[in-house]
C-alpha cells in the first residue's frame, strides 16, 4: 500500500497591511496649513501650538511655518508649528 497520509492545512500565512504610521514632517521642515506632521496610534507625540489633533490622533498643521519638536519637563514630546516671521514694513 503505497499511500500518503493527508497533509495538514496551514493556519498561518496571513499578515495585515502596514499602516504607514510615524513622523511625516520632521523638525525644521516647512509646512502649510493642513499638512500632516505625525500619524500615530495614541498620543506618543502631543499637540502643541498651531497644530490640531485628529480623532485618530493625527497631528496636523493649522498655520504655515516650521515644525518644532520639544520635550517638556513632564517627559512629553510636544509638536508645534512656529509661524514664519512676517516681513517688517
UniProtKB/Swiss-Prot annotation:
GO terms for cellular component: cytosolic large ribosomal subunit. Disulfide bonds: none annotated. This is Large ribosomal subunit protein bL27. GO terms for molecular function: structural constituent of ribosome. The gene is rpmA. Belongs to the bacterial ribosomal protein bL27 family. InterPro entries: Ribosomal_bL27, Ribosomal_bL27_CS. It comes from the Bacteria. The lineage of its organism: Bacteria, Pseudomonadati, Pseudomonadota, Alphaproteobacteria, Hyphomicrobiales. Residues 1-21 are annotated as: Disordered. One of its GO terms (biological process) is translation. Keywords: Ribonucleoprotein, Ribosomal protein.
Amino acid at each position: 500500500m503505497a499511500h500518503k497520509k493527508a497533509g495538514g492545512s496551514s493556519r498561518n500565512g496571513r499578515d495585515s497591511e502596514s499602516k504607514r504610521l510615524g513622523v511625516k514632517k520632521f523638525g525644521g521642515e516647512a509646512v502649510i496649513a493642513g499638512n500632516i506632521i505625525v500619524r500615530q496610534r495614541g498620543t506618543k507625540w502631543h499637540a502643541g501650538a498651531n497644530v490640531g489633533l485628529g480623532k485618530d490622533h493625527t497631528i496636523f498643521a493649522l498655520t504655515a511655518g516650521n515644525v518644532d519638536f520639544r520635550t517638556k519637563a513632564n517627559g512629553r514630546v510636544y509638536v508645534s508649528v512656529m509661524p514664519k516671521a512676517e516681513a517688517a514694513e
